[in-house]
Protein backbone atom coordinates (compact mmCIF):
# COMPACT_ATOMS: atom_id res chain seq x y z
CA UNK A 1 0.00 0.00 0.00
CA UNK A 2 1.27 3.48 -0.86
CA UNK A 3 2.52 5.42 2.16
CA UNK A 4 0.04 8.26 1.57
CA UNK A 5 -2.82 5.85 2.26
CA UNK A 6 -1.54 4.99 5.72
CA UNK A 7 -2.65 6.33 9.09
CA UNK A 8 -0.51 8.19 11.65
CA UNK A 9 -0.32 4.99 13.74
CA UNK A 10 0.87 2.91 10.77
CA UNK A 11 3.42 5.51 9.64
CA UNK A 12 4.68 5.90 13.21
CA UNK A 13 5.33 2.16 13.48
CA UNK A 14 7.11 2.02 10.11
CA UNK A 15 9.38 4.93 11.08
CA UNK A 16 10.08 3.51 14.57
CA UNK A 17 11.04 0.13 13.11
CA UNK A 18 13.21 2.00 10.59
CA UNK A 19 11.36 0.27 7.75
CA UNK A 20 10.85 3.65 6.10
CA UNK A 21 12.56 7.02 6.48
CA UNK A 22 10.66 10.23 7.26
CA UNK A 23 11.72 11.54 3.84
CA UNK A 24 10.08 8.57 2.09
CA UNK A 25 6.85 9.25 3.97
CA UNK A 26 6.84 12.95 3.12
CA UNK A 27 7.83 12.32 -0.52
CA UNK A 28 4.86 9.97 -0.91
CA UNK A 29 2.45 12.66 0.35
CA UNK A 30 4.25 15.32 -1.72
CA UNK A 31 3.76 13.25 -4.88
CA UNK A 32 0.09 12.72 -4.02
CA UNK A 33 -0.27 16.49 -3.52
CA UNK A 34 1.39 17.13 -6.88
CA UNK A 35 -1.07 14.73 -8.53
CA UNK A 36 -4.37 15.93 -7.05
CA UNK A 37 -4.02 19.33 -5.32
CA UNK A 38 -4.58 21.13 -8.64
CA UNK A 39 -8.08 19.56 -8.75
CA UNK A 40 -9.21 20.16 -5.15
CA UNK A 41 -7.22 23.29 -4.15
CA UNK A 42 -7.05 22.62 -0.42
CA UNK A 43 -3.90 24.67 0.34
CA UNK A 44 -3.65 28.45 0.57
CA UNK A 45 0.07 27.94 1.21
CA UNK A 46 1.49 24.66 -0.08
CA UNK A 47 4.58 23.76 1.99
CA UNK A 48 5.36 20.34 0.49
CA UNK A 49 8.80 21.39 -0.81
CA UNK A 50 9.82 22.66 2.63
CA UNK A 51 8.32 19.50 4.14
CA UNK A 52 10.58 17.32 1.99
CA UNK A 53 13.64 19.31 3.14
CA UNK A 54 12.55 19.07 6.78
CA UNK A 55 12.07 15.31 6.46
CA UNK A 56 15.63 14.92 5.13
CA UNK A 57 16.89 16.65 8.29
CA UNK A 58 14.85 14.19 10.36
CA UNK A 59 16.42 11.27 8.42
CA UNK A 60 19.82 12.36 9.71
CA UNK A 61 18.56 13.02 13.22
CA UNK A 62 16.90 9.63 13.79
CA UNK A 63 20.08 7.65 14.44
CA UNK A 64 21.02 9.94 17.37
CA UNK A 65 17.70 9.46 19.17
CA UNK A 66 17.18 6.97 21.97
CA UNK A 67 13.44 7.60 21.87
CA UNK A 68 11.55 8.66 18.76
CA UNK A 69 9.05 11.51 19.35
CA UNK A 70 5.43 10.59 18.76
CA UNK A 71 4.87 12.48 15.50
CA UNK A 72 8.42 12.14 14.18
CA UNK A 73 8.22 12.73 10.42
CA UNK A 74 4.40 12.63 10.36
CA UNK A 75 2.82 15.12 7.90
CA UNK A 76 -0.08 17.25 9.19
CA UNK A 77 -1.98 20.07 7.43
CA UNK A 78 -2.99 23.18 9.40
CA UNK A 79 -6.05 25.40 8.92
CA UNK A 80 -4.96 28.87 7.89
CA UNK A 81 -6.45 30.64 10.92
CA UNK A 82 -3.94 29.00 13.28
CA UNK A 83 -0.75 31.00 13.82
CA UNK A 84 2.46 29.50 12.44
CA UNK A 85 5.67 31.41 13.14
CA UNK A 86 7.34 32.56 9.93
CA UNK A 87 4.59 31.03 7.76
CA UNK A 88 1.86 33.17 6.21
CA UNK A 89 -1.44 32.96 8.10
CA UNK A 90 -4.18 34.57 6.03
CA UNK A 91 -7.56 33.41 7.43
CA UNK A 92 -8.36 33.28 3.67
CA UNK A 93 -8.93 37.04 3.82
CA UNK A 94 -7.52 39.86 1.73
CA UNK A 95 -7.02 41.84 4.94
CA UNK A 96 -4.41 39.29 6.17
CA UNK A 97 -3.16 38.13 2.76
CA UNK A 98 0.50 38.85 3.54
CA UNK A 99 0.46 38.51 7.32
CA UNK A 100 3.31 36.38 8.72
CA UNK A 101 2.91 35.76 12.48
CA UNK A 102 5.95 36.19 14.74
CA UNK A 103 4.73 33.36 17.01
CA UNK A 104 3.28 29.84 17.00
CA UNK A 105 -0.13 28.90 18.35
CA UNK A 106 0.12 26.63 21.41
CA UNK A 107 -1.19 23.65 19.40
CA UNK A 108 1.57 24.19 16.81
CA UNK A 109 4.19 24.35 19.55
CA UNK A 110 2.87 21.05 20.94
CA UNK A 111 3.02 19.40 17.50
CA UNK A 112 6.54 20.77 16.94
CA UNK A 113 7.65 19.30 20.27
CA UNK A 114 6.67 15.90 18.82
CA UNK A 115 8.59 16.63 15.56
CA UNK A 116 5.65 16.75 13.16
CA UNK A 117 6.07 18.04 9.60
CA UNK A 118 3.71 20.75 8.35
CA UNK A 119 2.50 20.11 4.78
CA UNK A 120 0.64 23.38 4.24
CA UNK A 121 -1.92 25.92 5.44
CA UNK A 122 -5.41 24.97 4.34
CA UNK A 123 -8.16 27.07 2.79
CA UNK A 124 -11.22 28.16 4.78
CA UNK A 125 -14.24 30.42 4.64
CA UNK A 126 -12.87 33.89 5.38
CA UNK A 127 -12.26 34.23 9.14
CA UNK A 128 -14.00 30.83 9.51
CA UNK A 129 -17.37 32.36 8.61
CA UNK A 130 -19.20 29.96 6.34
CA UNK A 131 -20.24 26.39 5.67
CA UNK A 132 -18.83 25.71 2.21
CA UNK A 133 -15.34 27.30 1.88
CA UNK A 134 -16.84 29.41 -0.91
CA UNK A 135 -16.29 32.52 1.24
CA UNK A 136 -12.50 32.29 0.88
CA UNK A 137 -11.06 35.48 -0.62
CA UNK A 138 -8.72 33.37 -2.79
CA UNK A 139 -10.46 30.37 -4.37
CA UNK A 140 -13.05 27.66 -3.79
CA UNK A 141 -11.87 24.29 -2.45
CA UNK A 142 -13.61 21.31 -4.07
CA UNK A 143 -14.97 18.14 -2.52
CA UNK A 144 -12.67 15.21 -3.44
CA UNK A 145 -15.72 12.92 -3.83
CA UNK A 146 -17.32 15.20 -6.43
CA UNK A 147 -15.38 18.18 -7.75
CA UNK A 148 -18.59 20.09 -8.52
CA UNK A 149 -19.54 20.08 -4.84
CA UNK A 150 -18.39 21.95 -1.74
CA UNK A 151 -16.17 20.28 0.89
CA UNK A 152 -18.16 21.98 3.64
CA UNK A 153 -16.84 24.71 5.88
CA UNK A 154 -15.37 26.58 7.38
CA UNK A 155 -12.49 24.05 7.60
CA UNK A 156 -13.09 22.79 4.04
CA UNK A 157 -9.42 22.80 3.05
CA UNK A 158 -8.41 20.63 6.02
CA UNK A 159 -11.24 18.13 5.41
CA UNK A 160 -10.49 17.91 1.67
CA UNK A 161 -6.74 17.44 2.30
CA UNK A 162 -7.30 14.46 4.62
CA UNK A 163 -10.05 13.03 2.41
CA UNK A 164 -7.86 13.14 -0.71
CA UNK A 165 -4.79 11.72 1.05
CA UNK A 166 -2.63 14.87 1.05
CA UNK A 167 -2.00 14.32 4.77
CA UNK A 168 -3.12 11.64 7.26
CA UNK A 169 -4.43 14.37 9.57
CA UNK A 170 -5.16 18.08 9.81
CA UNK A 171 -6.08 20.67 12.42
CA UNK A 172 -9.20 22.79 12.07
CA UNK A 173 -11.38 25.00 14.22
CA UNK A 174 -15.07 24.62 15.03
CA UNK A 175 -17.34 27.50 16.06
CA UNK A 176 -20.71 26.11 14.99
CA UNK A 177 -19.83 22.95 13.08
CA UNK A 178 -16.74 23.98 11.11
CA UNK A 179 -14.92 20.67 11.75
CA UNK A 180 -17.81 18.23 11.95
CA UNK A 181 -19.80 19.41 8.92
CA UNK A 182 -16.85 19.31 6.43
CA UNK A 183 -15.74 15.98 7.95
CA UNK A 184 -19.21 14.61 7.13
CA UNK A 185 -19.18 16.06 3.60
CA UNK A 186 -15.68 14.69 2.86
CA UNK A 187 -16.01 11.29 4.55
CA UNK A 188 -13.41 11.69 7.30
CA UNK A 189 -13.46 11.82 11.12
CA UNK A 190 -13.74 15.28 12.68
CA UNK A 191 -13.59 16.02 16.41
CA UNK A 192 -14.55 19.23 18.17
CA UNK A 193 -13.28 18.78 21.74
CA UNK A 194 -14.96 20.25 24.83
CA UNK A 195 -14.62 24.05 25.03
CA UNK A 196 -11.40 24.61 27.01
CA UNK A 197 -9.88 21.17 26.34
CA UNK A 198 -7.47 22.58 23.74
CA UNK A 199 -5.75 25.97 24.01
CA UNK A 200 -7.05 28.69 21.66
CA UNK A 201 -3.85 30.75 21.97
CA UNK A 202 -2.83 31.59 18.41
CA UNK A 203 -6.21 30.72 16.88
CA UNK A 204 -7.50 33.84 15.14
CA UNK A 205 -10.70 34.60 17.03
CA UNK A 206 -14.13 34.52 15.38
CA UNK A 207 -16.44 33.96 18.39
CA UNK A 208 -14.30 33.47 21.47
CA UNK A 209 -16.92 31.70 23.60
CA UNK A 210 -17.64 29.13 20.86
CA UNK A 211 -14.33 28.56 18.99
CA UNK A 212 -12.40 25.36 19.62
CA UNK A 213 -9.46 23.76 17.80
CA UNK A 214 -9.90 20.12 16.80
CA UNK A 215 -8.75 17.39 14.44
CA UNK A 216 -9.42 15.69 11.12
CA UNK A 217 -8.20 12.11 10.73
CA UNK A 218 -9.06 8.91 8.88
CA UNK A 219 -9.08 6.66 11.98
CA UNK A 220 -10.37 7.07 15.54
CA UNK A 221 -6.99 5.85 16.79
CA UNK A 222 -5.30 8.82 15.10
CA UNK A 223 -7.84 11.17 16.70
CA UNK A 224 -6.89 9.79 20.13
CA UNK A 225 -3.15 10.14 19.41
CA UNK A 226 -3.51 13.78 18.33
CA UNK A 227 -5.92 14.72 21.11
CA UNK A 228 -3.40 13.45 23.69
CA UNK A 229 -0.82 15.84 22.23
CA UNK A 230 -2.83 19.03 21.72
CA UNK A 231 -4.96 18.94 24.92
CA UNK A 232 -4.21 20.49 28.28
CA UNK A 233 -4.02 23.71 30.29
CA UNK A 234 -2.15 26.62 28.75
CA UNK A 235 -1.17 29.68 30.81
CA UNK A 236 -1.52 31.75 27.62
CA UNK A 237 -5.25 30.95 27.33
CA UNK A 238 -7.31 31.70 30.43
CA UNK A 239 -10.26 29.74 28.99
CA UNK A 240 -8.22 26.53 28.67
CA UNK A 241 -9.33 24.09 31.36
CA UNK A 242 -7.06 22.97 34.16
CA UNK A 243 -8.30 19.39 33.84
CA UNK A 244 -6.23 16.25 33.78
CA UNK A 245 -5.87 14.91 30.23
CA UNK A 246 -6.51 11.15 30.19
CA UNK A 247 -4.66 8.91 27.75
CA UNK A 248 -7.33 8.82 25.06
CA UNK A 249 -5.79 5.73 23.42
CA UNK A 250 -6.93 3.79 26.52
CA UNK A 251 -10.51 4.14 25.25
CA UNK A 252 -9.72 2.17 22.09
CA UNK A 253 -10.52 -1.54 21.65
CA UNK A 254 -13.12 -1.56 24.43
CA UNK A 255 -16.60 -3.00 24.26
CA UNK A 256 -19.62 -0.73 24.58
CA UNK A 257 -21.93 -3.03 26.56
CA UNK A 258 -24.29 -1.03 28.76
CA UNK A 259 -23.43 2.36 27.26
CA UNK A 260 -26.65 4.37 26.95
CA UNK A 261 -26.97 6.22 23.64
CA UNK A 262 -29.55 9.02 23.45
CA UNK A 263 -31.48 9.53 20.21
CA UNK A 264 -32.95 13.07 20.36
CA UNK A 265 -36.25 13.43 18.49
CA UNK A 266 -35.49 17.09 17.61
CA UNK A 267 -32.58 15.95 15.40
CA UNK A 268 -34.68 13.58 13.27
CA UNK A 269 -37.16 16.10 11.91
CA UNK A 270 -38.55 17.36 8.63
CA UNK A 271 -35.72 18.70 6.49
CA UNK A 272 -33.48 15.73 7.25
CA UNK A 273 -32.89 13.69 4.08
CA UNK A 274 -34.66 10.32 4.39
CA UNK A 275 -31.63 8.28 3.24
CA UNK A 276 -29.39 10.00 5.79
CA UNK A 277 -31.94 9.32 8.52
CA UNK A 278 -31.99 5.65 7.48
CA UNK A 279 -28.17 5.35 7.45
CA UNK A 280 -27.81 7.02 10.86
CA UNK A 281 -30.52 4.86 12.44
CA UNK A 282 -28.99 1.70 10.89
CA UNK A 283 -25.68 2.74 12.48
CA UNK A 284 -27.38 3.23 15.85
CA UNK A 285 -28.89 -0.26 15.55
CA UNK A 286 -25.42 -1.70 14.84
CA UNK A 287 -24.20 -0.18 18.11
CA UNK A 288 -27.24 -1.63 19.87
CA UNK A 289 -26.27 -5.10 18.59
CA UNK A 290 -22.87 -4.53 20.22
CA UNK A 291 -24.54 -4.14 23.61
CA UNK A 292 -25.27 -0.41 23.74
CA UNK A 293 -28.73 0.70 24.81
CA UNK A 294 -30.69 3.15 22.63
CA UNK A 295 -32.79 5.66 24.57
CA UNK A 296 -35.27 8.14 23.03
CA UNK A 297 -34.70 11.62 24.46
CA UNK A 298 -36.07 15.12 23.91
CA UNK A 299 -34.03 18.34 23.86
CA UNK A 300 -36.72 20.92 23.07
CA UNK A 301 -34.61 24.09 23.20
CA UNK A 302 -32.06 22.85 20.64
CA UNK A 303 -34.45 23.81 17.84
CA UNK A 304 -33.71 27.47 18.63
CA UNK A 305 -29.94 26.96 18.46
CA UNK A 306 -29.43 28.37 14.94
CA UNK A 307 -31.33 31.59 15.71
CA UNK A 308 -29.45 32.16 18.98
CA UNK A 309 -26.11 31.24 17.38
CA UNK A 310 -26.54 33.81 14.60
CA UNK A 311 -26.91 36.54 17.20
CA UNK A 312 -24.16 35.47 19.63
CA UNK A 313 -21.47 34.50 17.08
CA UNK A 314 -21.74 37.68 14.93
CA UNK A 315 -21.83 39.82 18.09
CA UNK A 316 -18.53 38.35 19.26
CA UNK A 317 -17.13 38.61 15.72
CA UNK A 318 -17.99 42.30 15.42
CA UNK A 319 -15.93 42.91 18.56
CA UNK A 320 -13.06 40.55 17.65
CA UNK A 321 -12.69 41.86 14.09
CA UNK A 322 -12.53 45.51 15.19
CA UNK A 323 -8.75 45.01 15.48
CA UNK A 324 -8.29 44.85 11.68
CA UNK A 325 -7.91 48.53 10.89
CA UNK A 326 -4.80 48.70 8.70
CA UNK A 327 -2.66 50.38 11.36
CA UNK A 328 -0.24 47.78 12.75
CA UNK A 329 -0.44 44.82 10.38
CA UNK A 330 -2.39 43.38 7.48
CA UNK A 331 -3.82 45.11 4.44
CA UNK A 332 -4.12 48.90 4.33
CA UNK A 333 -6.08 50.85 1.70
CA UNK A 334 -3.78 53.00 -0.42
CA UNK A 335 -6.01 55.97 -1.25
CA UNK A 336 -7.35 57.98 1.71
CA UNK A 337 -7.29 61.55 2.99
CA UNK A 338 -7.51 61.06 6.76
CA UNK A 339 -7.36 58.38 9.46
CA UNK A 340 -11.10 57.75 9.54
CA UNK A 341 -11.20 57.22 5.77
CA UNK A 342 -8.19 54.89 6.04
CA UNK A 343 -10.07 52.74 8.59
CA UNK A 344 -13.29 52.53 6.61
CA UNK A 345 -11.64 51.96 3.21
CA UNK A 346 -9.28 49.33 4.62
CA UNK A 347 -12.16 47.38 6.13
CA UNK A 348 -14.38 47.88 3.07
CA UNK A 349 -11.70 46.64 0.65
CA UNK A 350 -10.20 44.04 3.00
CA UNK A 351 -13.27 42.11 4.20
CA UNK A 352 -15.50 39.92 2.02
CA UNK A 353 -19.31 40.05 1.84
CA UNK A 354 -20.08 37.35 4.45
CA UNK A 355 -17.67 38.82 7.01
CA UNK A 356 -19.22 42.27 6.51
CA UNK A 357 -22.70 40.75 6.86
CA UNK A 358 -21.80 39.17 10.19
CA UNK A 359 -20.03 42.26 11.54
CA UNK A 360 -23.15 44.30 10.72
CA UNK A 361 -25.48 41.70 12.27
CA UNK A 362 -23.35 41.61 15.41
CA UNK A 363 -23.01 45.36 15.73
CA UNK A 364 -26.79 45.70 15.35
CA UNK A 365 -27.46 43.03 18.00
CA UNK A 366 -25.17 44.78 20.47
CA UNK A 367 -26.41 48.31 19.81
CA UNK A 368 -28.38 50.15 22.49
CA UNK A 369 -32.09 49.51 22.24
CA UNK A 370 -31.53 46.10 20.64
CA UNK A 371 -29.09 44.51 23.11
CA UNK A 372 -31.83 43.24 25.45
CA UNK A 373 -34.14 42.12 22.65
CA UNK A 374 -31.48 40.18 20.76
CA UNK A 375 -28.14 39.51 22.47
CA UNK A 376 -29.41 39.06 26.02
CA UNK A 377 -32.31 36.89 24.86
CA UNK A 378 -29.95 34.72 22.77
CA UNK A 379 -27.71 34.21 25.81
CA UNK A 380 -30.74 33.05 27.82
CA UNK A 381 -31.59 30.55 25.07
CA UNK A 382 -27.98 29.38 25.16
CA UNK A 383 -28.31 28.62 28.88
CA UNK A 384 -31.47 26.62 28.20
CA UNK A 385 -29.68 24.63 25.46
CA UNK A 386 -26.88 23.83 27.92
CA UNK A 387 -29.49 22.70 30.45
CA UNK A 388 -31.13 20.48 27.79
CA UNK A 389 -27.81 18.69 27.28
CA UNK A 390 -27.12 18.33 31.00
CA UNK A 391 -30.60 16.93 31.59
CA UNK A 392 -30.14 14.44 28.73
CA UNK A 393 -26.78 13.35 30.15
CA UNK A 394 -28.46 12.42 33.44
CA UNK A 395 -30.02 9.45 31.63
CA UNK A 396 -27.58 8.74 28.75
CA UNK A 397 -23.79 8.55 28.30
CA UNK A 398 -23.64 9.85 24.75
CA UNK A 399 -25.99 11.37 22.15
CA UNK A 400 -26.20 10.19 18.53
CA UNK A 401 -27.50 12.38 15.68
CA UNK A 402 -26.93 13.01 11.97
CA UNK A 403 -24.08 15.51 11.41
CA UNK A 404 -25.80 17.30 8.51
CA UNK A 405 -29.33 17.34 7.07
CA UNK A 406 -28.04 16.39 3.60
CA UNK A 407 -24.87 15.45 1.70
CA UNK A 408 -22.49 18.02 0.17
CA UNK A 409 -24.31 20.52 -2.03
CA UNK A 410 -23.17 21.88 -5.41
CA UNK A 411 -20.76 24.81 -5.59
CA UNK A 412 -22.79 27.99 -6.06
CA UNK A 413 -26.08 26.37 -5.01
CA UNK A 414 -26.51 28.31 -1.76
CA UNK A 415 -24.24 31.32 -2.26
CA UNK A 416 -27.14 33.74 -2.79
CA UNK A 417 -29.21 32.32 0.06
CA UNK A 418 -27.31 32.77 3.34
CA UNK A 419 -30.18 31.38 5.42
CA UNK A 420 -30.13 28.08 3.51
CA UNK A 421 -26.35 27.98 3.97
CA UNK A 422 -26.72 28.59 7.73
CA UNK A 423 -29.12 25.64 8.01
CA UNK A 424 -26.44 23.15 6.95
CA UNK A 425 -25.12 23.56 10.54
CA UNK A 426 -28.52 22.91 12.15
CA UNK A 427 -27.36 19.71 13.93
CA UNK A 428 -23.93 21.00 14.99
CA UNK A 429 -24.34 24.52 16.47
CA UNK A 430 -26.07 23.41 19.68
CA UNK A 431 -22.93 21.43 20.61
CA UNK A 432 -20.85 24.65 20.53
CA UNK A 433 -23.54 26.57 22.40
CA UNK A 434 -23.37 23.98 25.20
CA UNK A 435 -19.56 23.71 25.03
CA UNK A 436 -19.69 19.90 24.90
CA UNK A 437 -17.53 17.64 22.66
CA UNK A 438 -18.81 16.32 19.33
CA UNK A 439 -17.40 14.05 16.64
CA UNK A 440 -18.53 13.28 13.10
CA UNK A 441 -17.70 9.83 11.75
CA UNK A 442 -18.51 8.43 8.29
CA UNK A 443 -21.46 6.03 8.36
CA UNK A 444 -22.12 5.38 4.67
CA UNK A 445 -22.80 6.96 1.29
CA UNK A 446 -25.77 8.51 -0.49
CA UNK A 447 -25.42 8.64 -4.30
CA UNK A 448 -21.64 8.23 -3.96
CA UNK A 449 -21.31 11.07 -1.44
CA UNK A 450 -20.24 10.53 2.19
CA UNK A 451 -22.71 10.74 5.07
CA UNK A 452 -21.65 11.61 8.63
CA UNK A 453 -23.02 10.55 12.00
CA UNK A 454 -22.46 12.78 15.05
CA UNK A 455 -21.58 11.53 18.53
CA UNK A 456 -21.93 14.08 21.34
CA UNK A 457 -20.41 13.55 24.79
CA UNK A 458 -20.55 14.98 28.29
CA UNK A 459 -18.17 17.89 29.03
CA UNK A 460 -14.56 16.62 29.05
CA UNK A 461 -15.68 13.09 28.18
CA UNK A 462 -14.14 12.78 24.72
CA UNK A 463 -13.08 9.32 25.92
CA UNK A 464 -16.57 7.80 25.65
CA UNK A 465 -17.00 9.33 22.17
CA UNK A 466 -13.69 7.73 21.14
CA UNK A 467 -14.75 4.39 22.67
CA UNK A 468 -18.08 4.28 20.79
CA UNK A 469 -16.64 5.67 17.53
CA UNK A 470 -13.80 3.14 17.63
CA UNK A 471 -16.23 0.26 18.12
CA UNK A 472 -18.37 1.54 15.23
CA UNK A 473 -15.43 1.94 12.84
CA UNK A 474 -14.39 -1.64 13.57
CA UNK A 475 -17.82 -2.71 12.27
CA UNK A 476 -17.97 -0.23 9.38
CA UNK A 477 -14.52 0.98 8.36
CA UNK A 478 -14.29 3.69 5.71
CA UNK A 479 -10.68 4.68 6.49
CA UNK A 480 -9.27 3.04 3.36
CA UNK A 481 -11.98 4.40 1.04
CA UNK A 482 -10.35 7.12 -1.03
CA UNK A 483 -12.14 9.20 -3.66
CA UNK A 484 -11.23 8.55 -7.31
CA UNK A 485 -9.28 11.62 -8.38
Swiss-Prot record:
GO cellular component: glutamyl-tRNA(Gln) amidotransferase complex
EC number of the protein: 6.3.5.7
InterPro entries: Amidase (IPR000120), Amidase_CS (IPR020556), Amidase_dom (IPR023631), AS_sf (IPR036928), GatA (IPR004412)
Catalytic activity: L-glutamyl-tRNA(Gln) + L-glutamine + ATP + H2O = L-glutaminyl-tRNA(Gln) + L-glutamate + ADP + phosphate + H(+)
Active-site residue list: 79, 154, 178
SUPFAM superfamilies (UniProt xref): Amidase signature (AS) enzymes (SSF75304)
UniProtKB keywords: ATP-binding, Ligase, Nucleotide-binding, Protein biosynthesis
Keyword flag Glycoprotein: no
Function: Allows the formation of correctly charged Gln-tRNA(Gln) through the transamidation of misacylated Glu-tRNA(Gln) in organisms which lack glutaminyl-tRNA synthetase. The reaction takes place in the presence of glutamine and ATP through an activated gamma-phospho-Glu-tRNA(Gln).
Protein name (database record): Glutamyl-tRNA(Gln) amidotransferase subunit A
Gene name as annotated: gatA
Amino acid sequence: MELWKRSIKELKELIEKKEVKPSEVIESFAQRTKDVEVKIKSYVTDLTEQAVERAKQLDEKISDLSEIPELFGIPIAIKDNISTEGIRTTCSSKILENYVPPFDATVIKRLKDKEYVITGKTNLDEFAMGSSTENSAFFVTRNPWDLDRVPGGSSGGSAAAVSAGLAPAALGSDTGGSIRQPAAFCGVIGLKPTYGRVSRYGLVAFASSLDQIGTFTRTVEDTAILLNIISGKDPKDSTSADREVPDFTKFLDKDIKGIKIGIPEEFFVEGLDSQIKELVMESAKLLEKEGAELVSISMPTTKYAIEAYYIIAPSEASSNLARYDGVRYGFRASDYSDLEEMYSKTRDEGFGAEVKRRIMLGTYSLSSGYYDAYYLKAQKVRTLIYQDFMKAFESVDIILTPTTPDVAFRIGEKVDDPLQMYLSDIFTVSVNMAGVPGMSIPCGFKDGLPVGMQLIGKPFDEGTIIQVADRFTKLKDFSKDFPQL
